[in-house]
């Protein structure tokens, strides 16, 4: 009944939690990843993996206390997150086609592994698989294999 329904979507919900997540953005030169600890407040209504990707989409300029002169965004601004799903420790991320337009001055590896390494910082995620508008793409930026499952790559972290 309506009387027994509990609405916990209120912004003052006591179910809100805060987590510090290490996110990865591009170095100024664009060839390395820079680890940035980011505090994220969330509740049960939106999955943490979605919030983390949304922050990557916004870029580092929206994070308090972070100087964007040292780091840069890795995802094109007009990219849309269509869907994110977690199943059996694999995070499935579906972006719009704009994701394939690698930002100038950033290597393909840095663009992809900023998302992969950030998601794998979250509990229960060990692998990431990408799709574009619901379909598998074989290559990212016509150069890097993109159809496989990705695991963490710490070699790119400076």
Q: PLM ranges: what are they?
A:
Residues 1-158:
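Bimodal "functional hotspot" detector
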């Amino acid at each position: 009944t309506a009387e027994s329904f509990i609405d916990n979507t209120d912004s003052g919900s006591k179910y809100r939690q805060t987590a510090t997540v290490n996110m990865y953005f591009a170095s100024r030169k664009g060839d390395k990843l820079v680890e940035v600890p980011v505090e994220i407040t969330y509740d049960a209504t939106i999955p943490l993996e979605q919030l983390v990707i949304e922050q990557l989409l916004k870029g580092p300029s929206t994070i308090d206390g972070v100087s964007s002169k040292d780091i840069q965004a890795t995802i094109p601004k007009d990219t849309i997150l269509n869907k994110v799903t977690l199943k059996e420790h694999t995070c499935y991320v579906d972006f719009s086609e704009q994701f394939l337009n690698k930002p100038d001055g950033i290597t393909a590896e840095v663009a992809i592994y900023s998302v992969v390494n950030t998601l794998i910082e979250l509990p229960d995620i060990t692998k990431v698989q990408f799709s574009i508008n619901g379909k598998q793409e074989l290559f990212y930026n016509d150069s890097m294999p993109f159809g496989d499952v990705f695991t963490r790559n710490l070699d790119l972290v400076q």
